[in-house]
A protein has these predicted regions:
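Long insertion/accessory domains within large nucleic-acid-processing enzymes
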Residues: 1-4, 9, 77-284, 288-747
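Intrinsically disordered, low-complexity, charge-biased terminal/linker regions in eukaryotic proteins
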Residues: 1-81, 89, 93
Length: 747
């Protein structure tokens, strides 16, 4: 039974959807059968297959020959089926939201189409109606499926943001109150209490909770959504910091060298099913060829099925989706087996970043107020180097003029700007610097009709303005250039260059970490890189190992995200245990060493007896798990109560300090810290807020960066920043900000 907050009446879920809508609105809604006359007219319209959205056929099963009635009915039934899924609990006010977003535009579409058909019948015969009356001056169908609130640009920065966006829900409230934002008790197990935006939409935009496998108790629902389920020791953190950690996970970039986290949850393994770049085999058979663009699988009947894979594919957020084949020629695969794996995954486990050796201590003011000090090793060895890919399309319209040989000869334009097939082929594979032009084209300047310019050879012409397509970042590599004509790829020739309708340029590259980039942990601990020190100047452990990153201790007590300290200590245990097992190898001594640790844990961790017994039995039978052969990872249940006594037990068994702390040596000051410093391994994410994306174009007056981040521009220093510096009498800084010395650019 469903209870509405305004009417207070019980509604039977088996009622007709129109009856429920009528109950909510108090109005009368006509059924589809009432418009049978209009639908008869629509059924006889000549539909063109290439005008239908391809997504409709894939998602809703819409065919090119379907009528308007069939299209709307299929979409209606599909959405209705998803909302009535028994696995999804009843959400407070969900039905009213559903009809406001889905049913209202549908009824509006019927009304609009009725007017269009009746008006068109005055000017056309019955057979003269075509699809153009819908996509011409009145694009009604397009506005329903492309401009509706449910039609959104997918956030695919990483698998977490993609999975979270697909599970997002929002209340359509014009003026939400505080009562609307409060987490209702009926949401538990259906809507996540943690993940929500930090903006004015807080509590209004929500996310469905995700299912998970609980080793302690079999339950049908999980309380948190997908991003919070990736935070180990979630119950050790303040909820506000968990919210920030969830949002940071959705902003992490794919790294060139990502590794397993030292401490993971169950959903790090389940994430494999959330990303579309993990391509599965459509049929069972034998792999016959593995290439850079496709994999071929030969079935039992002798047919070869090609499976396309992606190389330097650009997502909506310009992240690089490069898939790595996981099979080789001759392998036997079944339907559903993984063929390729994206860079977000290693052996089926989600790897958002790489664990770094971290130490918590104030360091000479460089990590004041959430600033971060990192080692030069992270730059030189590409540990925090992110990859990007970008696609630019130059579409030719009536005003776009490409400087071909004939065009340059007619209008006396420099031969340096000539573009032909040889020039295009020579640009493929080039590495460009930031601001270096890749293509030139011209647009005519609109002038008064009687104003004509005479060129040297006597031809009259209008004035042309030169437009450049330039590289946005350093070390931009041109991967491919395509000539397209009506979405068909043409061969790069001079003849095809004159008749193509667009040119597609694919570039890719890497971003090394630098001062000003934003880093974050999974527990909501975030900051910007303020100093990159040489490896010789980084603090050192007692055994001489330099740390990778130095964080400030003042960022923990007031934020109350203590889960990062548990992850820090267990990460140190994981790395130490890996080194011990690597030293012992697959010997009786190594198996005995691991078995004794599991026996100790069995006495301390009560609910996991069965799991630990299986591991001990495997070791007794001479089996070593696949994880131990490559790395040692602690798999933590989401809300498992791990006490400090358990962590101390593991540290003590491995011969490490119980407090996971030691006196560090500071080479910069040639002294040892007076107090112990806690150290270990934390997962550090590199976020999409990079400093090289923030400072781009500048205005003419104050030489400040222009706004509009989407146009490859950056942030500008406004009046309030100027006042703040003025109040501190920072004249030198103001001089740098407001004059030409604020950036390294010409003229």
């Amino acid at each position: 039974m469903i209870r509405h907050q305004n009417y207070g009446t019980d509604l039977d879920p088996q009622l007709s959807q129109y009856d429920i809508f009528k109950e909510y609105t108090g109005g009368y809604v006509k059924s589809i059968s009432a418009n049978k006359t209009i639908m008869d007219i629509l059924s006889n319209i000549d539909w063109e297959s290439n005008n239908l959205n391809v997504i409709l056929s894939k998602v809703f099963g819409v065919n090119p020959g379907d009528s308007i009635e069939e299209i709307v009915e299929k979409v209606h039934s599909q959405v209705k089926q998803n909302y009535n899924n028994p696995a999804s609990k009843s959400i407070y006010g969900r039905e009213a939201l559903y009809y406001k977003i889905i049913e209202s535009p549908t009824q509006w579409l019927y009304k609009e189409l009725t007017g269009i058909i009746e008006k068109s019948l005055f000017f056309h015969t019955f057979k003269g109606l075509s699809w153009n009356i819908f996509v011409g001056k009145s694009p009604r169908i397009r506005s329903l499926f492309l401009q509706n609130k449910l039609s959104q640009w997918l956030e695919d920065t990483n698998p977490v943001s993609e999975g979270s966006h697909k599970r997002r829900i929002a209340y359509d409230l014009d003026l939400p109150t505080n009562d609307d934002r409060i987490y209702h008790s009926s949401y538990r197990g259906t809507v996540c209490p943690i993940e929500t935006p930090e903006s004015g939409k807080i509590g209004i935009v929500l996310n469905y909770a995700s299912g998970y496998r609980n080793t302690n108790k079999d339950t049908g629902y999980n309380i948190v959504a997908l991003p919070p389920s990736l935070i180990p020791f979630l119950n050790k953190n303040d909820a506000n910091r968990c919210l920030m950690g969830s949002n940071m996970l959705k902003q992490s970039l794919p790294l060139k060298k990502s590794k397993w986290s030292k401490v993971i949850t169950e959903n790090y393994i389940n994430m494999y099913n959330y990303h579309w770049t993990n391509i599965k085999s459509p049929v069972a058979g034998v792999v016959t060829s593995v290439g850079t663009n496709r994999i071929r699988v030969k079935t039992g009947s002798g047919e070869e099925i090609p499976v396309e894979i992606y190389t330097n594919f650009s997502g909506n957020k310009k992240t690089n989706y490069t898939t790595v084949p996981k099979v080789k020629v001759g392998d036997r695969v079944e339907a559903g087996d993984i063929l390729t794996e994206s860079k977000f995954f290693k052996s089926g486990v989600y790897t958002p970043s790489t664990p770094l050796l971290a130490a918590y201590l104030p360091y000479n003011g460089y990590n004041f107020e959430d600033s971060i000090v990192i080692s030069q090793r992270l730059v030189d060895e590409d540990i925090l180097t992110s990859e990007w890919a970008e696609t630019e399309t130059l579409t030719f319209d009536k005003e776009t003029l490409l400087p071909t040989q004939g065009f340059c000869d007619d209008y006396n334009i420099s031969q340096d700007w000539v573009i032909n097939s040889e020039v295009i082929k020579s640009k493929i594979g080039q590495t460009l610097h930031s601001g270096e032009p890749l293509f030139h084209y011209f647009r005519p300047v609109k002038l008064v009709d009687d104003f004509i310019v005479k060129t040297d050879n006597g031809y009259p012409q209008n004035l042309f303005s030169l437009v450049d397509i330039r590289a946005h970042y350093d070390d931009s590599r041109v991967d491919a250039i395509y000539l397209l004509q009506d979405n068909e790829i043409l061969e790069i020739t001079d003849e095809n260059l004159n008749k193509c309708t667009s040119i597609v340029i694919c570039t890719s590259g890497c971003h090394k970490v630098e001062e000003g980039d934003k880093l974050s942990g999974v527990h909501g601990n975030k900051g910007t890189v303020s100093k990159i020190l040489p490896v010789d100047m980084m603090p050192r452990l007692p055994d001489g190992t330099p740390v990778d990153i130095v964080l400030n201790t003042m960022g923990i007590p007031s934020r109350m995200n203590v889960g990062q300290l548990f992850e820090l200590s267990l990460g140190l245990c994981s790395e130490t245990l890996r080194k011990r097992l690597e030293e012992y190898g697959d010997t009786d001594k190594g198996r005995e060493y691991l078995r004794n640790l599991l026996v100790l844990l069995k006495e301390e961790i009560k609910p996991n007896h069965d799991l630990l017994d299986e591991l001990i039995e495997d070791i007794d039978n001479g089996l070593v798990t696949k994880m131990v052969n490559t790395d040692v990872v602690f798999l933590m249940p989401q809300f498992q109560e791990i006490t400090t006594s358990v962590v101390k037990l593991i540290l003590r068994y491995l011969g490490l300090p119980e407090d996971s702390a030691a006196h560090l040596y500071l080479p910069e000051f040639d002294e040892t810290t007076k107090r112990k410093v806690i150290y270990g391994y934390n997962t550090i994410l590199k976020l999409e807020h990079m400093v090289k994306k923030k400072t781009k174009a500048r205005c003419n007056g104050l030489n400040n960066p222009d706004p509009t981040f989407e146009e490859h521009r950056g942030q500008r220093s406004g009046e309030m920043e100027f006042w703040a510096l003025e109040s501190h009498h920072a004249t030198a800084t103001i001089n740098e900000m407001l004059k030409y010395t604020s950036g390294n650019y010409q003229n």
